[in-house]
UniProtKB/Swiss-Prot annotation:
UniProt KW keywords: Activator, DNA-binding, Homeobox, Nucleus, Phosphoprotein, Transcription, Transcription regulation
Biased composition (Polar residues): 353-371
Pfam families the record matches: HNF-1_N, HNF-1B_C
Species the sequence originates in: Sus scrofa
Record has Oxidoreductase as a keyword: no
GO biological process terms, semicolon-separated: endocrine pancreas development; genitalia development; insulin secretion; kidney development; liver development; positive regulation of DNA-templated transcription; regulation of transcription by RNA polymerase II
Chain positions covered by the region annotation Dimerization: 1-31
GO molecular function, one term: RNA polymerase II cis-regulatory region sequence-specific DNA binding
Compositionally biased region (Low complexity): 328-341
Assembly notes: Binds DNA as a dimer. Can form homodimer or heterodimer with HNF1-alpha. Interacts (via HNF-p1 domain) with PCBD1; the interaction increases its transactivation activity.
Protein name per the record: Hepatocyte nuclear factor 1-beta
Modification Phosphoserine occurs at: 49, 52, 75, 80
Entry superkingdom: Eukaryota
Start and end residues of each stretch annotated as Disordered: 328-371
Length: 559
């Protein structure tokens, strides 16, 4: 006899035999692993009470044979993921109350399904549940299975114990019989149907009345099995056929009339019956899945609410996106890491002046100084411009300017929001100034490094109460490098003063020399060291000017 084993199988058998395992042990192990034909649920007619009466009352008794030795559980291949002990399912105990013929038929059908492929049976049960809109929760309540394990078994074919599969198949067989009985049930009269539907609605709303309607014998039976969970009512679930009809009707009319809703009820029930493979005249057999006019009304009301909520969400998202875009634009403009461009000076992306003449000079300087908080290093753009070329009707910067000036006292608004520079229109067209965009503290640091005294006329863009004002001239007339002079960078306790104290401090300055518009250009002895400058700064930096002594007078004009 030619062996049908492969070389690998022969090696495995040889290794088992050489390890000391006898033939009898191998045969016994094979019998335990392989399912026997007597697997499943078997029925026997045993007397209910052997010691009472001569005529025994026979009822079906179920024995779940898990293996040849009737052990309590199977091997690891049939084990569940949760690993909990699973006693006799409640549904098997309830099956004892059925008639003998029905119980025998159900047991035979369950035994047949247990002998087949579990994955094939799982797909069949899943399709039946989808066809009749049966939720998995109903199966869990009846069989006591774990819902996660049941879902994995139906969807992915996860192995399940034979005892659990027997409970699942028993539910499936009983559900088929129950649904078939519902559709084959005949109604005596329309009045009886109305009374039954009214009673069902009352029990649907008040399930506690169903317990009161039970007889004393049924109550005793219910109390004798406290382990059974209380059955919850099945929640109505729209089928795919009905949803397709309702969505098409919603596209035509969002708020149908009562007559239109009743027509939709008939159409939906007809579609549900066709989905289940029964005649539309047996729509009463749908049970909890029966479509009513109230359910259609609620469906349309819910769709209208969802549509309105979706519109509001879209509006809020659009508003939020606009706000975020504006904030990102502002942050990108206020970024201190501005990359200089290699384009001509009149096309700088950061700063652009409308000017005439060929005296354009573009350079970059780095100003470093130490303050009370940190070192400030700023990149400045210097341009030799003619103030007369700045039209009073135009802003200092073009609207598309992107350069922002950040100072130690906090970020400033975009420079493009400056007011009209109307004070420059009185200057001499031949006058030229260097415009330095840097904090005032940086200008003071430069001033301390000079070796000569000189009078300066610095137009200052003042920031009062958090907003930018127009150019304000500041005149310096002091010895900038005296040994006894205190550092100008020292911050006073009242540096963050309000607008009113600031104006009062300015008006109290002695020997103030207000800026007068002269037609002749000013003469400086050291123009290459510290030329006139325009300082873009905030209130916290300008307030340091008020702490200067009488030899360091800085009259300001603010409005």
């Amino acid at each position: 006899m030619v062996s049908k084993l492969t070389s690998l199988q022969q090696e495995l058998l040889s290794a088992l035999l050489s390890s000391g395992v006898t033939k009898e042990v191998l045969v016994q192990a094979l019998e335990e692993l392989l399912p026997s034909p007597s697997f499943g649920v078997k029925l026997e007619t045993l007397p209910l009470s052997p010691g009472s009466g001569t005529e025994p009352d026979t009822k079906p008794v179920f024995h779940t044979l898990t293996n040849g030795h009737a052990k309590g559980r199977l091997s690891g291949d049939e084990g569940s993921e949760d690993g909990d002990d699973y006693d006799t399912p409640p549904i098997l105990k309830e099956l004892q109350a059925l008639n003998t013929e029905e119980a025998a038929d159900d047991g035979a059908e369950v035994d047949r399904m247990l002998s087949e492929d579990p994955w094939r049976a799982a797909k069949m049960i899943k399709g039946y549940m989808q066809q009749h809109n049966i939720p998995q929760r109903e199966v869990v309540d009846v069989t006591g299975l774990n819902q996660s394990h049941l879902s994995q078994h139906l969807n992915k074919g996860t192995p399940m114990k034979t005892q659990k599969r027997a409970a699942l198949y028993t539910w499936y067989v009983r559900k088929q019989r129950e649904i078939l009985r519902q559709f084959n049930q005949t109604v005596q009269s329309s009045g009886n149907l109305t009374d039954k539907s009214s009673q069902d609605q009352l029990l649907f709303l008040f399930p506690e009345f169903s317990q009161q309607s039970q007889g004393p014998g049924q109550s005793d039976d219910a109390c004798s099995e406290p382990t059974n969970k209380k059955m919850r009512r099945n929640r109505f679930k729209w089928g795919p056929a009905s949803q397709q009809i309702l969505y098409q009707a919603y596209d035509r009319q969002k708020n149908p009339s009562k007559e239109e809703r009743e027509a939709l009820v008939e159409e939906c029930n007809r579609a549900e019956c066709l989905q289940r493979g029964v005649s539309p005249s047996k729509a009463h057999g749908l049970g909890s899945n029966l479509v009513t006019e109230v359910r259609v009304y609620n469906w349309f009301a819910n769709r209208r609410k969802e549509e309105e909520a979706f519109r509001q969400k879209l509006a809020m998202d659009a508003y939020s996106s606009n706000q975020t875009h504006s904030l990102n634009t502002l942050l990108s403009h206020s970024s201190p890491h501005h990359q200089p461009s290699t384009s001509p000076p009149n096309k700088l992306p950061g700063v652009r002046y409308n000017q005439q003449g060929n005296n354009e000079v573009t350079s970059s300087s780095t100003i470093s100084h130490h303050g009370n908080s940190a070192m400030v290093t700023s990149q400045s753009v210097l341009q030799q411009v003619s103030p007369a070329s700045l039209d009073p009707g135009h802003n200092l910067l073009s609207p598309d300017g992107k350069m922002q000036i950040s100072v130690s006292g906090g970020g400033l608004p975009p420079v493009s929001t400056l007011t009209n520079i109307h004070s420059l229109s009185h200057h001499n067209p031949q006058q030229s100034q260097n415009l330095i965009m840097t904090p005032l503290s940086g200008v003071m640091a430069i001033a301390q490094s000079l070796n000569s005294s000189q009078a300066q006329s610095v137009p200052v863009i003042n920031s009062v109460a958090g907003s930018l004002a127009a150019l304000q001239p500041v005149q310096f007339s002091q010895q900038l490098h005296s040994p006894h002079q205190q550092p100008l960078m020292q911050q006073s306790p009242g540096s963050h003063m309000a607008q009113q104290p600031f104006m009062a401090a300015v008006t109290q300055l002695q020997n103030s020399h207000m800026y007068t518009h002269k037609q002749e250009p000013p003469q400086y002895s050291h123009t290459s060291r510290f030329p006139p400058a325009m300082v873009v700064t905030d209130t916290s930096s300008i307030s340091t000017l008020t702490n200067m002594s009488s030899s360091k007078q800085c009259p300001l004009q603010a409005w």
